[in-house]
Amino acid sequence: MMKKLKASEIRQKYLDFFVEKGHMVEPSAPLVPIDDDTLLWINSGVATLKKYFDGRETPKKPRIVNSQKAIRTNDIENVGFTARHHTFFEMLGNFSIGDYFKQEAIEFAWEFLTSDKWMGMEPDKLYVTIHPEDMEAYNIWHKDIGLEESRIIRIEGNFWDIGEGPSGPNTEIFYDRGEAYGQDDPAEEMYPGGENERYLEVWNLVFSEFNHNKDHSYTPLPNKNIDTGMGLERMASVSQNVRTNYETDLFMPIMNEIEKVSGKQYLVNNEQDVAFKVIADHIRTIAFAISDGALPANEGRGYVLRRLLRRAVRFSQTLGINEPFMYKLVDIVADIMEPYYPNVKEKADFIKRVIKSEEERFHETLEDGLAILNELIKKAKATTNEINGKDAFKLYDTYGFPIELTEEIAVQAGLKVDMTTFESEMQQQRDRARQARQNSQSMQVQSEVLKNITSASTFVGYDTATAQTTLTHLIYNGEEVSQVEAGETVYFMLTETPFYAISGGQVADTGIVYNDNFEIAVSEVTKAPNGQNLHKGVVQFGQVNVGATVSAEVNQNDRRDIQKNHSATHLLHAALKSVLGDHVNQAGSLVEADRLRFDFSHFGPMTNDEIDQVERLVNEEIWKGIDVNIQEMDIASAKEMGAMALFGEKYGDVVRVVNMAPFSIELCGGIHVRNTSEIGLFKIVSESGTGAGVRRIEALTGKAAFLYLEDIQEKFNTMKSQLKVKSDDQVVDKLTQLQDEEKALLKQLEQRDKEITSLKMGNIEDQVEEINGYKVLVTEVDVPNAKAIRSTMDDFKSKLQDTIIILASNVDDKVSMVATVPKSLTNNVKAGDLIKQMAPIVGGKGGGRPDMAQGGGTQPENISKSLSFIKDYIKNL
């Protein structure tokens, strides 16, 4: 009989089973992809293993197992309305990189599911689907496993193909939950592989045996691979015998807390249940994403978080929750997912702070959405009695406004919504997401030349910048050759090399490899799939031959500067954590000879004071002259001594610790100074944002920092000369004096402009008209600049407090316009509406609040026409 297991027990059993079968456990990678710009999020178990499947790297073991957290947001609108849609989920997977294939993969799956030692599922409740032409899989299921033919369903769609790269047939395993979930009926898709609640897919085994080529042909892969996926949430629902994933132990503690806060019960009312499921799903996604370095923003993955949070809060309002509360669920998520994912609990305080701040902001956004909807209703009443579908979609997509609420409010106003256009816009968005998803999953075709080179190449560059060595392999035009002529670009390997390969943000060494017969100028060094350093260079003279004895020399000036910048980067990382907080994590870095660049997670710009503090901390550690001790040790010992592992990096059993204790202890494979005093000087030259919740610091060290400061000093001396001051201290005082004088002169000028405008206008009270019962001043004013029209308006408002005032001006052939409406009249007349009506006439746009709005345009010749039009508009209100 099938065992009733907690989700954490299923996860552990899965990992333990495949470890027994010779698999290596690959730890779950962060949700924010590392070194993969094609993905917004890690969205599958295989996403982090692409480097193994496409041959860029060779894993330590060809058999891999993982439990990978993942985010998919292409079907957000379905989450909450179905039993199993999630934005955050865990994918259990076992993988073979050129090792076992269909026979073992199917046998492993069957044993894990049916053995009493593991899941203990009843074999007669399991069905499988296969590709119609995959007779090998059919024979294994039927003859070797003993599954009767009626339980093997052939489906044409059982072929995994996402474009160029590995592809192949797949087999899916289904669990029959029984007649309580539906009677067999092909017309209702009540069969394994159909859309139904009875037969649940619990495992997908992909047999990757073909390359999908650029010309859309298929060729057999030299190394066949296995890629499988089992959703933990779904397997938990089967094991725990509950109707939906949301009733498992992964979700019910969250549901219980929502019940406490809302006073409503889960599983009592279907409409309420949608809100419960949306909140529970989205808080898991948000908490994990923030713990992995993402932050809410207006673009990219930050926008996804913001949209999810808004959607959850919006649904919480249907449960009567009208204040920030999502942040209170973070501790529950952390407790459920610990200890396999300790990161959420470790960062819980920071996660809660970010979520609470976002919740508070959302209520303002919701009010804005309602205001825009009210404007759309007015527009529809004046035209077609239908709210434009594009406007409704924008309201949904930008403000997170539910289309159902838009429809409900529209019906109350006697209107309808153009749902055809809305659905078209929604479908276009889905199509874009689907295309992006397919493109992002595409893997590179395997490179067999480098993959087949297994001879060793030892890096000796930690201790020396030169080496006497042997050239072992030459690759020219994608093929291994024995010799290369002068002028050609070539890739090559050495038995021993002092050249550092680009890694961990540090650029590769450059230099020369030579003997009496030839010379190669080395420009790049990368890692080959089997770990050797692969050098790229141009043959300067002579003929290069495999087996030649050569001298390898690194450019030592560049090497020294790279060492300074790399060690300074470690100090910078530690200083940022000290000043800003432990939430700071490296999000990317670049260590070159002439500069360093460091990207890190932080939710806002650094203040000047924070930048100064960080810079001073780094320089103090430099001036202390701390010895840089570098040791290799096992990962457990490194963590015990407090070494900081870079977020998202994968480490082996033995790691290299760069120790500048007590300030910085970090795992790193790069090249460093021997003492921090060698860095000399550290200077931050810029701090900026690069996207969603990521900041960037660029800095200089040593001579480059000195030259930068020298240049600033020269500019400062020039400024002193122009200001005619003698001492440095007098510069600020002189600038303050000049700024004060400028302000006074501008104020005088502004007053004079007002007086001139007033003289030109004459008695404005005499120009006020009564239109449709309102006092109205509509006029063109002659002002020197666009700013002056606002000050003129302020002057007029003080004299005509009960009057609707609309001013327009022509400044440098551009139209400026401003409108004000007394607050006592804004229920009937809105300044924003007035400007929106006028602006198109002068070739522009505008808007604003009900009591104050402004706009502009590019057709000053139409100012008079726009003023006449607005008078008629007010007359017909």
From Swiss-Prot:
KW tRNA processing (keyword) present: no
The cofactors named for this UniProt entry are: Zn(2+)
InterPro entries attached to this UniProt entry: aa-tRNA-synth_II/BPL/LPL (IPR045864), Ala-tRNA-lgiase_IIc (IPR002318), Ala-tRNA-ligase_IIc_anticod-bd (IPR018162), Ala-tRNA-synth_IIc_core (IPR018165), Ala-tRNA-synth_IIc_N (IPR018164), Ala-tRNA_ligase (IPR050058), Ala_tRNA_ligase_euk/bac (IPR023033), DHHA1_dom (IPR003156)
EC number, UniProt record: 6.1.1.7
Name the principal localization, coarsely classed: cytoplasm
Q: Which GO terms describe its molecular function?
A: alanine-tRNA ligase activity; aminoacyl-tRNA deacylase activity; ATP binding; catalytic activity, acting on a protein; transferase activity; tRNA binding; zinc ion binding
Which Gene Ontology terms of cellular component type are present? cytosol
* Domain commentary: Consists of three domains; the N-terminal catalytic domain, the editing domain and the C-terminal C-Ala domain. The editing domain removes incorrectly charged amino acids, while the C-Ala domain, along with tRNA(Ala), serves as a bridge to cooperatively bring together the editing and aminoacylation centers thus stimulating deacylation of misacylated tRNAs.
Q: What is this protein called?
A: Alanine--tRNA ligase
List the GO biological process terms.
alanyl-tRNA aminoacylation
Keyword Transferase attached: no
Q: Which reaction does it catalyse?
A: tRNA(Ala) + L-alanine + ATP = L-alanyl-tRNA(Ala) + AMP + diphosphate
PANTHER family attached here? ALANINE--TRNA LIGASE, CYTOPLASMIC (PTHR11777:SF9), ALANYL-TRNA SYNTHETASE (PTHR11777)
Job description of the protein: Catalyzes the attachment of alanine to tRNA(Ala) in a two-step reaction: alanine is first activated by ATP to form Ala-AMP and then transferred to the acceptor end of tRNA(Ala). Also edits incorrectly charged Ser-tRNA(Ala) and Gly-tRNA(Ala) via its editing domain.
- The gene designation is alaS
Q: Which residues bind Zn(2+)?
A: 566, 570, 668, 672
Protein family (similarity comment): Belongs to the class-II aminoacyl-tRNA synthetase family.
Species assigned in the record? Staphylococcus aureus (strain USA300 / TCH1516)
Q: Which HAMAP family match?
A: Ala_tRNA_synth_B (MF_00036_B)
